[in-house]
A protein has these predicted regions:
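Long alpha-helical rod scaffolds of large eukaryotic non-enzymatic complex subunits
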Residues: 1-270
Length: 270
């Protein structure tokens, strides 16, 4: 069952690793010689580079081992998602899949912190722990690697209507927006917002931009308009744009759709 798989993957694994006596303290001692608690590089000394390289190798060994152990669970989740895109809708299935995956990333985040005693916060410094784990490609999602989630979503949305793409990115931005009160701002909520922001900025917003570009090319740039459509007819229901040139109408529709799917800062920059 799902609950049994979860218990083995996280609860039992945590028990096994924390019962390893001196293993974790030794691992953490090495990591702390290279990074602070938030994964930022410590003040450089003659041997800092050696410890950073050793820590990076341990990160890789740990995450690739987790990836191997969770391979069947990862494949099962993906298959269920693909089934739901057909039995429900691609938008509903994607929402469910994102929520489920964020929970798994959060659990992996917690395990990683307990093993290495650091919480690698997002940072663009090439010397940060975050960048070290981001470079570790796995089939499963982990704190530095959301690419498998993005790839699965994009694969499902590739053949979907543009509106479905917009519904997904719009929901993701709204669902994981800033909490309205401190009571709602739990550690998991903060982490989920971080995952959502990274997923949007690094993957889904560029994907959506490309989807709009393709639609503009198809319905505007390369569209053929019959001569009859060039005639200006009467205004309908008092709407000034109702008798506009067809391509102008379509352009306005696309702008409105983009505006609804994107946060204000991004739609204004367009």
């Amino acid at each position: 069952s799902d609950s049994t798989r979860h218990a083995l993957a996280y609860g039992r694994f945590e028990e096994m690793i924390t019962d390893s006596y001196s293993l974790l303290p030794n691992i953490q001692q090495v990591v702390h010689r290279a990074y602070d608690h938030y994964g930022q590089p410590v003040e450089s000394t003659s041997d800092t580079g050696v410890y950073a390289n050793t820590a990076s190798n341990m990160f890789r060994a740990y995450l690739t081992t987790r990836d191997r152990d969770l391979k069947l669970m990862t494949q099962h989740d993906l298959e269920e998602y693909q089934k739901e895109t057909k039995s429900l809708s691609v938008v509903t299935a994607t929402r469910n899949f994102v929520k489920q995956t964020f929970e798994k990333v959060y659990n992996e985040d917690g395990l990683f912190s307990k093993v290495f005693d650091i919480e690698p916060m997002w940072h663009n410094s090439p010397d940060s722990a975050f960048q070290a784990i981001k470079a570790i490609n796995t089939t499963m999602v982990h704190p530095g690697n959301l690419a498998p989630l993005a790839s699965s979503i994009q694969s499902s949305l590739q053949a979907a209507e543009l509106q479905a793409v917009c519904d997904v990115v719009g929901w993701l931005a709204n669902e994981y927006s800033v909490a309205e009160s401190d009571e709602e701002d739990s550690p998991s909520s903060r982490k989920h917002r971080e995952y959502a922001a990274r997923l949007l900025v690094e993957n889904l917003w560029p994907f959506t931009d490309n989807a709009f570009t393709a639609e503009i090319t198809k319905s505007i740039s390369r569209a053929s308009v019959p001569d009859s459509a060039l005639k200006i007819g009467p205004v309908e229901n008092g709407v000034a744009s109702s008798n506009a040139y067809p391509l102008v109408k379509r352009a306005v529709e696309l702008l409105a759709t983009f505006d609804q799917a994107m946060p204000k800062e991004r739609s204004v920059s367009l």
